[in-house]
């Protein structure tokens, strides 16, 4: 298979951000939004080299005149043409490599439709002619990155959250809980509650502004009701944010009302369990002998776990659910925003992993369905 001098490429295609780089590196070289933007208006200026589509940061910088679309929703690719554009941009513009010379490791959310995996495999081999590829579950990679082999990973990104129990390196698929509630839903909710304040955010470009406010100013309250009282009584919690046009927006209780949805999905009308409850359900679906090890290794990963106060709140909520004598430890590694990618980088540079790749020859022989046999 792959020679020792050929570096594998690791591509973590999130619903919100695409993280890409070379195996063995300690951080991704390229991190850009998983966005494809198309012009709203026809171009009339001569000499401007207008494209029919822009990807990533370029789309972000021209967002005022583009319609922005995310090809990945809730971890599932909904638009394959745009997805190909993102991969093309990743290989040729960001990493500047020829994909036909490098094995590629891709990631996906657990409990994804099988067709999604097959199509990914097909595009990699047929469109990009990669010599070998592999698809891995995101949460498992996060655990690798934290240096553990046992733990319960809560991975929450822009499109999907899931809790995955892993024991001695084995993921326990029957106990995985998937929650289609993540960063993008929080951004949408924030757009809605800011409307109550009289600020209108409606376009795809304005959604990106709200996402920025969310990333910079929100936090998770340890006691939501208490925090609401405090916010009503004083303006101590208020923060201001300067919009691109120079206007200043003041936000108060929206700062902690937004991420509260993670613990109370009913706030956005979703009939689902909060992230603390999903974690608890996952652990309860596991064998009674391994629960203790899972409770003391709850590992957070993904961008939506970056809110200040999340580990304290998580510990508090789980302590209320778990048996009273149970020791609960929530681990929030500082690099958790990229831990899926880091785990992929570690995994694909291991010598023992080299026989795991799906090679072009195997693909030609069996077709896309080989991905279910070779990739757990």
Swiss-Prot record:
It catalyses: ATP + H2O = ADP + phosphate + H(+). Pfam families: Actin. SUPFAM superfamilies: Actin-like ATPase domain. One of its GO terms (molecular function) is ATP binding. It comes from Achlya bisexualis. Belongs to the actin family. It comes from the Eukaryota. It is found in: Cytoplasm, Cytoskeleton. GO terms for cellular component: cytoplasm; cytoskeleton. Its EC number is 3.6.4.-. Keywords: ATP-binding, Cytoplasm, Cytoskeleton, Hydrolase, Nucleotide-binding. InterPro entries: Actin, Actin/actin-like_CS, Actin_CS, ATPase_NBD. Its main location: cytoplasm. This is Actin. Actins are highly conserved proteins that are involved in various types of cell motility and are ubiquitously expressed in all eukaryotic cells.
